[in-house]
């Protein structure tokens, strides 16, 4: 659904799954990394004449359609759903690209049952670098999750490992997280694992309910975690309601 896999090029723009592109993942076992709905996979920098050629521009990964997962799917590698970007990096060393713009999800995502290794839903950027702008999960991008992950669940406006600067990481949708998370839950305008970035704006404007059993940490709602050096401007805010339900368990930090 409008996704691009492994990229060896200086630019990639306009990976889009349109509003008519509804996706259903039913009874299936997938052993490879999978991308559903306006996603971009690995985009490593390449070497020409012994010199590293950086990806100059990664822009416009967008999902506008509803995506549903049934109860019998088992996905044994990373699974990206709804306007997500994986890695942008120089192979084996640093993660960077000159510019990464506009990672968007507008589509409602429902994951009910099933088992996932590592799951990213709704406007999530992986390991990036350079100048990163606009990683959004919009109001129509509601998320309902009631399944199991063996590792992390990232959802609704998350960016990781920003090397230079970032702006506007945000969630506007209402979200419910149930089930079991095998490691960490990150979501809703969250930025994490940052290295040497200079500025960022992070926000959550949706109502979030968590009833899940989370093995380690729970990082949700307009926040920065594990920041690096040279941080000279940060704006973190939350206007949505957050509910940690009676059934929720968090193994470490919230």
Report the location of each language-model feature:
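Surface-exposed loop/turn motifs in large extracellular/passenger domains
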Residues: 1-254
């Amino acid at each position: 659904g409008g996704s691009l896999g492994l990229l060896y090029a200086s630019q990639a723009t306009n990976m889009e799954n349109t509003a008519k592109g509804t996706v259903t993942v039913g009874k299936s076992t997938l052993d490879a990394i999978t991308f559903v709905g306006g996603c971009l996979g690995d985009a490593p920098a390449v070497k020409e004449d012994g010199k590293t050629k950086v990806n100059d521009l990664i822009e416009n990964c967008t999902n506008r359609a509803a995506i549903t997962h049934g109860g019998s799917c088992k996905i044994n590698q990373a699974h990206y759903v709804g306007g997500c970007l994986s890695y942008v990096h120089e192979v084996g060393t640093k993660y960077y690209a000159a510019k990464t713009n506009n990672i968007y999800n507008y589509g409602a995502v429902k994951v009910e049952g099933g088992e996932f290794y590592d799951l990213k839903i709704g406007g999530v950027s992986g390991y990036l670098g350079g100048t990163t702008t606009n990683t959004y999960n919009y109001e129509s991008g509601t998320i309902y999750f009631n399944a199991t992950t063996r590792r992390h669940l990232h959802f609704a406006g998350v960016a990781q490992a920003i090397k230079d600067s970032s702006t506007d990481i945000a969630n506007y949708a209402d979200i419910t997280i149930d089930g079991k998370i095998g490691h960490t839950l990150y979501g809703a305008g969250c930025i994490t694992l940052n290295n040497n970035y200079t500025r960022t704006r992070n926000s959550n404007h949706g109502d979030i309910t968590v009833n899940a059993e989370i093995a380690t940490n729970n990082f949700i709602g307009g926040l920065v975690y594990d920041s690096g050096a040279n941080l000279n401007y940060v704006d973190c805010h939350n206007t949505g309601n957050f509910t940690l339900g009676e059934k929720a368990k968090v193994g470490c930090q919230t």
